[in-house]
A protein has these predicted regions:
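Hydrophobic alpha-helical membrane segments
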Residues: 1-257
Length: 257
């Protein structure tokens, strides 16, 4: 393997993904505002179902899955170059709902199993932290696999593992670099989200809580929502480029580009 050529091909791939992201974000900028619609919906639902206990948690999970499915629908349209319109909102909740709910159900089962099987000791907490870290890594490309991958159901986990085995370094490198930059120089929580989004917890729902409480909160929420949009579109293009071939194939193609 020509490592110099691989580095050059990878940098060119990042550059191309960034260029495509800039073009698509300009064309469909309004999609960046959608989290400001999902957040109140989720928070109002949480308030109403809070007294219902486990049933309330189930309902809240369904609403979370609907919001995430809708957002992925619009991301898919942007990344695939399709025309996306606000009118599509009514259709957007359905296409990826079952894929999203499958992953959320898997995570719920894992958390319940850990709570039942492990006693609350220091060693158990360390094991739980390790398992959660592994899940964070394995699930990271799941949003892109949902709307670009070839698998359904729990087979998406296998596809994610295969993708990370082949292209994990190239996938995580820009997001780790962004997180480090944010931690030391620009502490904006949303910049950490590309490393956490695989759990489908939809970070934009936290852009705010009551982001309408003050002008400053609203401005912060809008900025966070747009940054999330830009990062997710970049992830979409990066995933497509990395999933289209092996490292050797990318090096070979870069020689003719």
């Amino acid at each position: 393997m020509d490592w110099g050529a691989l580095v050059a091909a990878t940098l060119r791939l990042y550059q191309q993904a960034g260029k495509e992201t800039w073009q698509k974000v300009q064309r469909s900028w309004w999609v960046g505002l959608l989290p400001l619609l999902y957040a109140p919906l989720f928070l109002l639902t949480a308030r109403f179902v809070a007294p219902l206990g486990m049933i309330g948690g189930f309902i809240l999970g369904l609403v979370l899955a609907l919001c995430t499915s809708s957002y992925l629908y619009f991301l898919a349209g942007v990344v695939n170059g399709n025309r996306v319109r606000p009118q599509d909102l009514l259709e957007s909740w359905r296409p990826y709902f079952f894929s999203v709910i499958t992953i959320l159900f898997f995570l719920t089962i894992v958390q319940y199993a850990l709570a039942l099987l492990l006693t609350p000791t220091a060693g158990a907490q360390a094991l739980i932290a390790l398992i959660n870290l592994i899940l964070l890594i394995i699930l990271n490309p799941i949003p892109e696999i949902i709307y670009q991958g070839r698998s359904e159901g729990l087979n998406m986990l296998q596809e994610s593992i295969e993708f990370l085995r082949d292209s994990g370094v190239e996938w995580f490198l820009p997001f780790v670099a962004l997180a480090v930059f944010s931690f030391f120089f620009f502490p904006l929580p949303i910049l950490m989200m590309p490393l956490q989004i695989g759990r489908l917890a939809f970070p934009a729902l936290g852009v705010g809580g009551a982001f309408w409480a003050s002008p400053g909160s609203l401005v912060s929420a809008v900025i966070s929502a747009f940054l999330l949009f830009v990062l997710m579109v970049f992830r979409g293009f990066l995933f497509r480029a990395l999933a289209s071939g092996t490292r050797r194939q990318r090096v070979f193609r870069s020689r003719f580009s």
